């Protein structure tokens, strides 16, 4: 779809990455890190047009001289000034449109505090003057993008992991599980266990290097104990070239890092359920008649589900928890890194959806709380 007058802006603001583009497109046009960078030392930045704030890729490329901050933590905006800068960058520098002329669909994690959603609404209508707004629940959008109306979505991004059962298009809020453990926690754990190799990572810039190591080299062990035994016998190391040209060898850290997704106690979250338990607990909170169908449609979504072997390990562990007659089916769409965005693109281009937008006139009349009436 051309970015004509009719197309809406779809913006999936993740804790780690912003995905932005136009409704009707099959993929986001712009994907950049949700980071805002400020110079550590103003003198050091002389001659670079003296900008005081850098956003996204530009902040990433200058990370050596900047202090980087993520305004979204665990799916909740913790710094609204920086969040506004990210949205401004999205509209004017990336999708390059005037938000006053396009409806905007934003996304958020389930069980977010109400005031988070109200503040998003307020900024969109008052700062950016958008004509209409909709805020969609991330997991529900992912299910739409997989072409299903019934299933349980396990959505794991950078800040939050949640399991959301959906039946005939309706999410079942009483059965949602949310754990504030996701990709960023894996990166921090990897930073910690990489110290065993003799390399220390401490700065915000070095954290980004470790995130790259995680995304490029880590995988899930199908059997953790067996993998540990094997790695003790043969190193199974992979080389990773650091930005300064030095090469670092990464060994059993490659599978110990994502193991956190199955054993959150590794990072001190003793009470938190791992991925298999989250799915199992969510399904068990649903009506007995829909459980079998949910077990047959476990849909993965988000960047932290991209690890090699994760779908297979998840299916194996869920079938150990589920009743013996049930054969769980884990669906891992190849585009699942962006399935929240794709679902938003599909939803906002449906003619039947057009009555769902919160209009500026409704906002002016009722204030930010209007968003709870129209966005579920």
UniProtKB/Swiss-Prot annotation:
Tell me which PROSITE patterns the record gives: ACTINS_1, ACTINS_2, ACTINS_ACT_LIKE
Q: Give this protein's Gene Ontology molecular function annotations.
A: ATP binding; hydrolase activity
The protein's matches in Pfam families, at most eight in alphabetical order, are given as:
Actin
Alphabetized UniProt keyword annotations:
ATP-binding, Cytoplasm, Cytoskeleton, Hydrolase, Nucleotide-binding
Tell me the enzyme class.
hydrolase
User: Carries keyword Nucleus?
Assistant: no
Tell where it localizes: Cytoplasm, Cytoskeleton
Example GO CC term: the record gives: cytoskeleton
Concerning Gene3D superfamilies, the annotation shows: 3.30.420.40, Actin, Chain A, domain 4
Q: Which E.C. number(s) belong to this protein?
A: 3.6.4.-
Q: Where does this chain mainly localize?
A: cytoplasm
Catalytic activity, as annotated: ATP + H2O = ADP + phosphate + H(+)
Tell me which InterPro entries the record gives.
Actin, Actin/actin-like_CS, Actin_CS, ATPase_NBD
At the top level, the lineage of the source is: Eukaryota
UniProt lists the family membership as follows: Belongs to the actin family.
Q: What does this protein do?
A: Actins are highly conserved proteins that are involved in various types of cell motility and are ubiquitously expressed in all eukaryotic cells.
Name of the protein: Actin
What organism does the UniProt record list as the source? Leishmania major
* Taxonomy of the source species: Eukaryota, Discoba, Euglenozoa, Kinetoplastea, Metakinetoplastina
